[in-house]
């Protein structure tokens, strides 16, 4: 944005380096609570790649103007709807599930239906580890602690930590919402397998939140799934998450998030039009359907114990058989059982990546897995202490001002 084009009595553009969502949101928070020409009561945080209607701002202002004192310190959490299916609400308040995944407190709401509109505005009991996504989140200034600002994670997890660590409570209202692209049909292994898991471990260690959740167990489960689907790059990303967490918090002291993102994005499988990687016809409608005839208990045992035949001689495999599977979370071991190769398909844009068995890569990943997990278990307490000790610095106003090249706070 050109500041000269937008700066006015009511708008001020603050140029910022690419320091990710965490850096941008923290800059906005600090500028808002430090402004001398007006006294902000709330700070509204929003993603820059969403579609929003003026009605959301009108309703937010009206809600805050009418709110009773006992609710005045609650976050106003705007809902996220799918840009690709604009009637579907994904989430207004999310929470960290017991298995370490993240998702909505409510079911998916079809907001063109009257019953969903009514249900969506009913009182609900929020889970203990609930959070407001920063695609649209309005935070009371009195709930912002200058000594506990966001964790400098670049992207993913900063909003979760801020809500949970600050024991946030929430207000939601139909019509306070945005539409976001990409959530409905785009899987990014770099973000979902590396960034989310690395940051989950960091915010848990740094702030002591989500104590009962075993994120390592979740990572181990994904590693087993991905290596059996011949997704060697995905396994690399999972191990990168643990390895870089174990290296400690020093990487967060300087703005290098963009460089880290690019280096790990290079490990994403390069999806190409199906016809360029596979000559036979593909039934895209069946990609997200499980096979009617599932594996027998004996077949499941062989699948798991041999990591889908990777510990066996090649003559055990189904020769000339290419399994067509989903490229994302969806998993049906029956499809890829002892397949010679696997075609990971995105039916949304008809692209695919052909995975081929590589026993050398398989062995390297298994050895790395053992090494990384052993190091984590042996050093977990010391690693967590490093993050706890760094929290006071990394979340302080003085750190963030230096990080963002802002002037020192006026005393």
Language model features by range: what are they?
Residues 1-14:
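Acidic donor-binding segment of Leloir-type glycosyltransferases
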Residues 16-35:
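Glycine-rich, basic loop-to-helix element that forms the pyrophosphate-binding segment
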Residues 37-51:
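Short beta-strand-to-loop acidic/aromatic patch adjacent to the donor-nucleotide binding site
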Residues 55-104:
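Conserved donor NDP-sugar-binding/catalytic core segment of glycosyltransferases
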Residues 107-136:
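A recurrent flexible, glycine/aromatic-enriched loop bordering the glycosyltransferase active site
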Residues 132-136, 145-164, 169-178, 188-191:
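Donor nucleotide-sugar recognition loop
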Residues 180-198:
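Nucleotide-sugar-dependent glycosyltransferase catalytic core
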Residues 198-411:
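Terminal low-complexity segments of carbohydrate-biosynthetic enzymes
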């Amino acid at each position: 944005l050109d500041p000269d084009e937008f700066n006015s009595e009511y708008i001020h553009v603050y140029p910022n380096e690419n320091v990710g969502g965490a850096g941008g949101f923290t800059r906005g928070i600090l500028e808002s609570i430090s402004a001398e020409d007006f006294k902000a009561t709330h700070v509204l945080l929003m993603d820059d790649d969403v579609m929003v209607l003026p009605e959301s701002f009108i309703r937010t202002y009206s809600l805050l103007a009418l709110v009773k004192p006992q609710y005045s310190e609650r976050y106003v959490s705007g809902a996220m709807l799918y840009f690709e299916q604009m009637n579907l609400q994904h989430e207004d308040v999310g929470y960290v599930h017991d298995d370490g995944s993240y998702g909505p407190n409510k079911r998916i709401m079809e907001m063109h239906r009257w019953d969903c509109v009514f249900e969506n505005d009913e009182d609900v009991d929020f889970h203990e580890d609930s959070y407001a996504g920063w695609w649209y989140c309005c935070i009371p200034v009195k709930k912002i602690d200058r000594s506990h600002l966001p964790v400098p994670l670049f992207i993913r997890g900063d909003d979760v930590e801020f809500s949970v660590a600050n024991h946030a409570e929430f207000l939601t209202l139909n019509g306070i919402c945005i539409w976001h692209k990409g959530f409905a049909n785009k899987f990014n292994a770099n973000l979902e397998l590396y960034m989310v898991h690395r940051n989950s471990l960091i915010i848990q260690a740094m702030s002591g939140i989500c104590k009962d959740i075993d994120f390592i167990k979740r990572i181990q489960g994904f590693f087993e799934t991905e290596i059996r689907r011949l997704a060697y790059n995905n396994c690399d990303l999972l191990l990168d998450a643990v390895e870089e967490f174990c290296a400690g918090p020093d990487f967060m002291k300087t703005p290098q998030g963009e460089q880290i993102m690019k280096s790990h994005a290079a490990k994403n499988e390069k999806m190409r039009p199906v016809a360029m990687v596979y000559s036979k016809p593909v039934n895209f409608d069946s990609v997200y359907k499980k096979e009617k005839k599932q594996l027998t208990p004996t077949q499941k045992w062989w699948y798991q114990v041999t990591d889908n035949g990777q510990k066996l001689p090649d003559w055990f495999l189904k020769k000339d058989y290419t399994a067509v599977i989903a490229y994302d979370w969806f998993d049906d071991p029956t499809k890829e059982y002892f397949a010679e190769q696997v075609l990971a398909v995105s039916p949304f844009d008809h692209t695919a990546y052909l995975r081929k068995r590589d026993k050398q890569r398989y062995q390297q990943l298994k050895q790395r897995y053992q090494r990384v997990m052993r190091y984590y278990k042996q050093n977990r307490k010391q690693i967590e202490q490093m993050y706890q000790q760094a929290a006071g610095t990394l979340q302080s106003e003085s750190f963030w001002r230096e990080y963002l090249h802002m002037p020192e706070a006026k005393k």
